Design a protein with these regions (language model features):
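Membrane-associated feature with strongest affinity for ZDHHC
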Residues: 1-282
Length: 282
């Protein structure tokens, strides 16, 4: 049986605010492209093109995070409809025995597979199926904000240098104010994204735990013994890569490692067999 989340209209207000900020930043960056005379136009054009490309990736992964569902349906494997509590994985609201590491979201009103947290900026829960998209969303969001700050850097410091910028309100001053707002918003959003992303990658990915589990277990020594390898956990979560040539490179590396492991395994077996044969002869 298909289940749906029960979000209200006000749950989408943060998403509307986010897209409004994107529109304001884009207009401010566009104004800065033609008004920032202290930077060469070719450099401004390059920064603006990179900004548009990274913004496209950011919006793409934001849309993926919003639309990919982690909801546990009644027909999922290891999910059973029951009328009484049987174990700790039982959800009293949904009346189902959930798969391990699943949790009920009070905002969505449903249980989610390996739920990490509910993100108001995407109006959806981050879980098993959209965790990869969330990591790439944070990455490209930070890259986008970085290039916006570079594009509007000179206008912002021109404002600090000339305090009388907005004393006479005219069209040119409005344009400069837009670029300054773009710089400030991008700086705040970028730093926030970097801090959240760094915390998420260093702790959640390294210890292979969710944000909910991090709050449940007050220190990492109490966490279940999941695989605690940052490189392997990170590669497992972000693959397949968004660019095919990067994915092909890692696939070739995986094949080489598998061949080496097989070769080493075979050599060890040969040594053991030779030792056993020598023991038998003796």
């Amino acid at each position: 049986m298909k289940r749906e989340c029960h979000l209200q209209w006000y749950n989408y207000i943060p998403v509307i605010i986010l897209y409004s900020a994107v529109i304001a930043i884009t207009f401010g960056s566009l104004f800065s492209l033609f008004t920032n005379t202290e930077m060469y136009f070719i450099i401004r054009l390059f920064l603006f093109i990179i900004y548009i490309i990274s913004l496209g990736f950011t919006l793409h992964y934001h849309y993926k995070c919003m639309t990919i569902s982690n909801i546990i349906d009644y027909g999922d494997d290891n999910t059973l409809i029951v009328t009484e509590e049987k174990d700790k994985n039982f959800c009293k609201i949904c009346k189902v025995n959930r798969p391990k590491r699943s949790h009920h979201c009070k905002v969505c009103g449903v249980c989610n597979l390996r739920m990490d947290h509910h993100c108001p900026w995407i109006a959806n829960c981050i879980g098993e199926k959209n965790e990869r998209e969330f990591i790439y969303f944070l990455l490209f969001c930070a890259i986008t904000c970085f290039f916006v700050c570079c594009l509007n850097f000179n206008n912002f410091f021109a404002f600090l240098k000339n305090r009388g910028l907005l004393q006479e309100i005219n069209y040119r001053d409005f344009i400069k104010a837009m670029t300054i707002c773009s710089f400030i918003i991008s700086l705040v959003v970028g730093l926030t994204t970097i801090l959240i992303g760094a915390h998420y990658l260093l702790y959640n990915v390294k210890y292979n735990i969710t944000s909910i589990e991090m709050f449940i277990y007050k220190n990492f020594s109490e966490c279940p013994d999941y695989e605690n390898d940052l490189k392997n956990n990170l590669l497992r979560k972000i693959r397949p890569f968004p660019f095919s040539f990067i994915e092909n490179y890692f696939r070739e590396a995986d094949n080489i490692n598998e061949e080496l492991n097989y070769k080493n395994f075979s050599e060890e077996n040969i040594k053991l067999l030779n030792e056993e044969n020598n023991m038998i002869k003796l």
